[in-house]
Curated annotation (Swiss-Prot):
Residues 99-129, 137-172, 180-215, 223-258, 266-301, 309-344, 398-433, 484-519, 572-607, 660-695 form the EGF-like domain. The gene is drpr. This is Protein draper. The chain crosses the membrane at residues 801-821. Residues 17-800 are extracellular. GO terms for molecular function: phosphatidylserine binding; scavenger receptor activity. It is found in: Cell membrane; Cell projection, Axon; Cytoplasm; Postsynaptic cell membrane. Induction: By axon injury which results in up-regulation on severed axons with levels reaching a peak between 12 and 24 hours after injury (at protein level). By ecdysone. By detection of apoptotic cells. It comes from Drosophila melanogaster. Expressed in adult head (at protein level). Expressed in glia, macrophages and ectoderm (at protein level). Detected in glia around the mushroom body dorsal lobe and in glial processes infiltrating the medial lobe (at protein level). Expressed in adult brain glia including antennal lobe glia (at protein level). Expressed in the larval fat body (at protein level). Expressed in the ovary (at protein level). Isoform B: Predominant isoform in adult glia. Phosphorylated on tyrosine residues. Phosphorylation is induced by binding to prtp. It is also induced by binding to the membrane phospholipid phosphatidylserine. Phosphorylation may be mediated directly or indirectly by Src42a and is required for interaction with shark. Pfam families: EGF_laminin. Glycans are attached at residues 73, 140, 183, 312, 329, 358, 418, 504, 540, 584-585, 630, 695, 795. One of its GO terms (cellular component) is axon. Residues 25-100 form the EMI domain.
């Protein structure tokens, strides 16, 4: 019984420990506890060990002793400390928690803290065992309660238990400020001056705040108590949430923010001052200056940039023809030669220009958008260039002014108008980067290849690239006898009638031969193809075994297929008296009489031929692999029957050139390089030929294989019968001869490059460098007389107008001065006689010798602009002068005085005209180096860009095997598209057929005849009174 009790106590202890160990929640305390632990430790222990040793005694052994050490384990008990969790005093463990403990149980309540009960309603006393009616308490409930505000009195002591929100002995007081609830124990959490209700704790917020805890400001637009009032502020002004006073945003003022800042001020409180020029106001919020029309900038200091106008320069001028517009209102200010609201109307007619519209434009108007009404310069249509707009854009350029670079690849041309790529034959795609798909070729890859036997088609020309062992136009003919490989270019090395494989040249030996090249006979005892068969001859009775068919050569008096018998033919047996029944020259076994079949036969009586595919002795040899013939062979000899048009041991070769048909016994009759079909004899004509014998040239306007394609040449030009290439006149190019040479190129198919030595030349599409209009001479450096007179007349007319205006102004000033002078004389009552003196300059300035001079202001109007390859821009021949030359006479050495006048030309004007070059006749710059727009030309003389200009060699030799194919590499010679493109055929035909400008003999001396001319006449000269020329 005692052990059971001990076990139960131990279990209770364990459970209690487990319960304490799992305690959780409040009212748990920690304490230190001592406990014992048994530990095992080691110890070194000494001991004596007895032994024996030799000694002089009997028996001769003596004892010996020595001390040794050993390790032993021992156990001891030690005390340790540990921290344990346990319920604090007054609490006991229950269901894993520490709960209060009342020693006297609460009868009508519950224990809420150590030794304290919380009684149910209507009960009281330490143990909640007293119950009195409401309003009474004490022993026998004889005493009346005096609690206020719905408070409950304790039935035992009469103490008042106050309702929520009240306090005091009798619960007569509300909770002090900042507290609320039962026993006023809860603390208010209202913020920003808010007060809470003493019962519920609800916050009553101060003005300007809201929210359960008064922690939020009034929302925008609200203010006051409970944020119930609306703000009166305008323009996004904010009101003060407590008082409702408006706080204005920058740029606004007034009680309700209704007014902008006064002019000249801006920003928060309108305290910032504007700093704008031109009297411009500033923005009332940002202070940004609001510039008047025509001005811009942070402070309206800058005028509008070119081609802009209006407020903030936000409007774009829409004036045409480089006209400027008024910066304030956008009114167009037209350049000379233009009129209209937008300066879009020419003063002159479309083909006229000049001050009086008396000059005719030299532009090709079909390809010209504009002939400038003042200068006569041609503004070319998109895709056209040159001074007269007669040339399409040069290679690889397109678009307005030919400024854009084409992105076409692989020799393609591009449309000079929109840059669309016109692919060369064999290419496709937007930029011609994609090769034709297999099986297609030609322009736009529109043609289908007709190559056979695995041949590939060259995408540009459609030429068939034959695989090894094949040839002919369509790769439909095997290699001829004794040739093999790619293009049948290799020679076979097979001997002794061996067959040569046309693909790889391997040898197939005839029966009786072996070796890689069939150079060795079969060894003795072997025969047949590859010497694979063993001779069956009785070597005792035979002389030899034929290496070809295995036939035995018997000794004398011996016979039979294998030389096996000495009986006469047709008999067998011991006495050779039995008749042999074997057929087809077969023999009998001399003993048994069984048939020994001859080559090519089988069966009991040798009556059956070898099965298909076999032949020879005992039908053991297989027929050779036949390339172009019947699958079977002769059952006796193994010979094969080739298909029509083939020969060779294995029918591997077609008929030799010029032969066709069965056994290649028929003769071909094809002409002009036509190839004869080795099977049918039908002629396959080269491109450009037709007819059954290829003896007829393609009809007019047709070309190509079978004459199936039509020529597309313009102007009735002839096309080549082989490839359709048009034979163009000089100055034209393109597959249709419809493209004039681009700027800078000339001659046959535009193959020559212009390298004109000066700006007075122009590149003629047919003849190369020729003089520009208005120039003549070997070096094109002499003005034609009519051109010089016209230029001088116009310049003289301009000078006359200018001098007239100067004289009129001078005359008006003199009249005004005389009027003032005499007015003063009269007012002073004085009389004076005026003396006017005219002086004569007896020492006119020294003038350097000079033959003549040109004023080039208008001298370049009729010129064609040209981009030179390797030359500097030639300057005008106007020598810089400070005074006007009046040299005259036969040698231009005489000088004449012109009254008392000494006229000095404006130096800037002279320099301006002196430095004018052909790119801009009136450009002025202080530095002559800067004046040469084309001074740095990278391409030296003779340079040609291989990526742009490939020269086509029309005399390119043809190959022996493909004489009808020529690869076209020139970018200009690609087959043209039918797409719409700029056409200048009509005008350029006229242009190229025009005679070249006449060449006048070079004048030795040309001078103005100034002998009887004074300055007035020179200054006011008209076209009718032009100075004469002296020769």
């Amino acid at each position: 019984m005692l052990p059971v009790i001990l076990i139960a106590c131990l279990a209770q202890l364990v459970l209690a420990q487990a319960d304490l160990k799992d305690l959780d929640g409040p009212n748990i305390c920690k304490r230190r506890e001592l406990y014992n632990v048994d530990v095992v430790y080691t110890e070194l222990q000494s001991f004596q060990e007895r032994g024996s040793t030799w000694c002089v005694t009997f028996p001769p052994r003596c004892s010996t002793y020595r001390i040794k050490h050993r390790v032993v384990n021992k156990t001891k008990t030690i005390a340790k400390n540990r921290i344990v969790r346990d319920c604090c005093d007054g609490y006991i463990a229950s269901a894993g928690e520490c709960v209060p403990h009342c020693s006297e149980p609460c009868q009508h309540g519950r224990c809420i803290s150590p030794e304290k009960c919380k009684c149910d309603h209507g009960y009281g006393g330490p143990a909640c065992d007293i119950n009195c009616p409401p309003g009474w308490y004490g022993r026998n409930c004889s005493m009346q309660c005096d609690c206020l505000n719905n408070a409950v009195c304790e039935p035992f002591s009469g103490d008042c238990e106050c309702a929520k929100g009240y306090t005091g002995a009798r619960c007569a007081d509300i909770c002090p400020e900042g507290f609320f609830g039962a026993n006023c124990s809860e603390k208010c959490r209202c913020e920003n001056g808010g007060k809470c209700h003493h019962v519920s704790g609800e916050c009553q917020c101060a003005p300007g705040f809201t929210g359960p805890l008064c922690d939020m400001r009034c929302p925008d637009g609200k203010h006051g108590a409970q944020c119930q009032q609306d703000c009166p502020c305008q323009n996004d002004g904010k009101c003060q949430p407590e008082t409702g006073a408006c706080m204005c945003n920058p740029g606004w003022t007034g009680d309700v923010c209704a007014n902008k800042c006064p002019v000249g001020s801006y920003g928060p409180g309108c305290q910032e001052s504007c700093e704008c020029y031109k009297g411009a106001p500033c923005h009332h919020i940002t202070g940004q200056c609001e510039c008047p029309p025509g001005y811009r900038g942070e402070r309206c200091f800058d005028e509008c940039q070119l081609n802009t106008y209006g407020f903030n320069c936000s409007m774009t001028c829409d004036c045409a023809n480089d006209a400027m517009c008024d910066r304030a209102n956008g009114t167009c200010i037209c350049n000379p030669g233009w009129t209209g609201a937008k300066c879009a109307e020419r003063i002159c007619e479309a083909n006229k220009y000049g001050l009086d519209c008396n000059r005719t434009c030299e532009c090709d108007m079909e390809h010209t958008d504009l002939c400038h009404p003042e200068t006569g310069n041609c503004q070319c249509s998109i895709g056209w260039s040159s001074a007269q707009c007669t040339r399409p854009c040069t290679f690889l350029r397109y678009g307005p002014n030919c400024e854009l670079t084409c992105n076409c690849k692989n020799g393609a041309k591009c449309s000079p108008v929109n840059g669309t790529c016109l692919c060369a034959p064999g290419w496709r795609g937007p930029t011609c980067e994609e090769s034709c798909e297999p099986g297609t070729f030609g322009q736009d890859c529109a043609l289908r290849c007709d190559c056979q036997n695995g041949a590939k088609c060259e995408p540009e020309t459609g030429q068939c690239l034959c695989t090894a062992g094949w040839k002919n136009i369509k790769c439909d003919r095997p290699c001829d006898l004794n040739h093999f490989g790619q293009d049948c270019a290799k020679v076979c090395d097979c001997h002794n009638n061996a067959a040569c494989n046309p693909q790889n040249g391997s040898c197939t030996c005839a029966a009786g031969w072996t070796g890689e090249r069939c150079e060795r006979k079969c060894d003795t005892g072997k025969f047949g193809h590859d010497c694979a068969q063993k001779c069956q001859c009785d070597f005792n009775n035979s002389l030899a075994c034929d290496a070809t068919n295995g036939r035995c050569v018997c000794k004398q008096d011996w016979g039979g297929v294998h030389c096996e018998t000495n009986c006469r033919s047709g008999y067998y047996g011991e006495n050779c008296d039995k008749v042999c029944r074997c057929l087809n020259n077969s023999s009998c076994d001399p003993d048994s009489g069984n048939c020994i079949c001859s080559a090519g036969w089988t069966g009991a009586d040798c009556a059956e031929p070898c099965p298909p595919g076999f032949y020879g002795m005992e039908c053991k040899e297989r027929c050779p692999e036949i390339l172009h013939g019947n699958k079977s062979c002769d059952h006796i000899t193994g010979e094969i029957l080739c298909r029509t048009g083939y020969i060779g041991l294995t029918c591997e070769h077609p008929c030799p050139a010029g032969l066709y048909g069965p056994g290649c016994k028929l003769k071909c009759n094809c002409e002009h390089g036509g190839e004869c079909n080795h099977v049918t004899g039908q002629c396959q004509c080269l491109p450009g030929w037709t007819g059954s014998n290829c003896n007829e040239s393609c009809p007019t306007d047709t070309y190509g294989q079978g004459c199936a394609q039509r020529c597309r040449c313009v102007h009735h030009k002839v096309c080549r019968k082989a490839d359709g290439m048009c034979i163009c006149e000089t100055g034209w190019s393109g597959t249709r001869c419809d493209e004039v040479c681009p700027e800078g190129f000339y001659g046959e198919h535009c193959m020559n490059t212009c390298a004109c030595p000066s700006a007075n030349f122009q590149c003629h599409a047919a003849h190369g460098c020729v003089c520009r209009s208005g120039y003549t001479g070997d070096n094109c450096d002499e003005l034609i007389a009519s051109q010089r007179i016209a230029d001088q007349s116009e310049n003289s007319s301009r000078a006359s107008v200018a001098l007239t205006l100067v004289l009129m102004t001078l005359f008006a000033c003199i009249i005004f001065a005389v009027f003032i002078y005499y007015r003063r004389r009269v007012s002073n009552l004085k009389t004076e006689i005026a003396h006017v003196h005219y002086t004569h300059d007896t020492n006119p300035p020294s003038w350097p010798p000079n033959h003549n001079f040109d004023n080039p202001v208008y001298g370049m109007q009729a010129e064609t602009r040209l981009l030179p390859n390797n030359m500097r821009s030639k300057m005008n021949n106007f020598d810089q002068r400070s005074t006007m030359s009046t040299d005259y006479g036969d040698d231009c050495n005489a000088s004449g005085r012109v009254g008392s006048y000494s006229i000095n030309y404006n130096h800037d004007l002279l320099t301006k005209n002196l430095n004018a070059d052909r790119t801009n006749p009136i450009v002025y710059n202080e530095s002559l180096k800067e004046e040469h727009v084309y001074d740095e030309i990278k391409h030296k003389e003779g340079y040609k860009d291989p990526d742009e200009y490939d020269h086509l060699d029309y005399s390119r030799p043809s190959t022996s095997q493909k004489p009808h194919y020529h690869r076209m590499n020139d970018a200009m010679l690609n087959i043209n598209q039918d797409e719409e493109k700029p056409s200048n055929v009509k005008n350029m035909t006229v242009l190229l057929n025009k005679p070249l400008p006449p060449t006048e003999p070079e004048p030795q001396h040309e001078c103005f005849d100034n002998t009887n001319t004074n300055l007035d006449n020179v200054s006011t000269a008209s076209p009718s009174s032009s100075p004469k020329f002296l020769k």
